[in-house]
A protein has these predicted regions:
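Catalytic core of non-heme Fe(II) oxygenases with the double-stranded beta-helix
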Residues: 80-147, 151, 155
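Non-heme Fe(II)/2-oxoglutarate
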Residues: 1-77
Length: 156
């Protein structure tokens, strides 16, 4: 039998990083709730209508610092934070499929997770015939954050 030389190449890989913050999330929750009605957009069909202003504060600074440190340790890359906001789901709310195409890295940090909270689902566009073929879902956990490529479609 003739031996054949075969090589395999990985042409698609998407990394998602999971970490945990040590920040005072109860205090951050109060800051976010106090700004709940201070929307990033007043236009109801704008995706930013669901998002609230999160004023600069030491708790967010700590979380961002932890994320930057963890990302650097995992990738040896430096990050610069462009912006952040609050996103509060009331009971039975969801977020439509979207991405942050203009960001190199995006992140979400769970400040509080009531019973019955929805999973975050990441859906890469790797199969043109089945958009959910490579979907991955993660249960929300208080204090946990996920960092992922800005182009990665996701929803709750």
């Amino acid at each position: 039998m003739q031996t054949r030389e075969v090589k395999m190449f990985n042409i698609a890989r998407i990394d998602l990083m999971k970490g945990r913050t040590n920040a005072n999330l109860d205090e951050l929750k109060n800051i976010l709730l106090a700004n709940y009605d201070n929307r990033l957009s007043d236009v109801i069909d704008d995706t930013s209508f669901e998002d609230s202003v999160c004023p600069p504060n030491e708790i967010c600074d700590q979380i961002i610092s932890e994320m930057i440190t963890d990302f650097k340790a995992a990738t040896d890359e430096d990050l610069v934070i462009a912006n952040y906001w609050g996103h509060i789901h009331e009971k039975n709310m969801s977020t439509t499929l979207h991405n942050h195409f203009d960001a190199y890295v995006s992140a979400v940090c769970y400040v509080e997770v009531p019973k019955g909270s929805g999973c975050i689902v990441f859906r890469p566009r790797l199969n043109q015939y089945n958009n959910s073929a490579y979907a991955s879902r993660f249960d929300p956990e208080k204090g946990v954050y996920y960092m992922f490529p800005g182009y990665l479609d996701h929803f709750v």
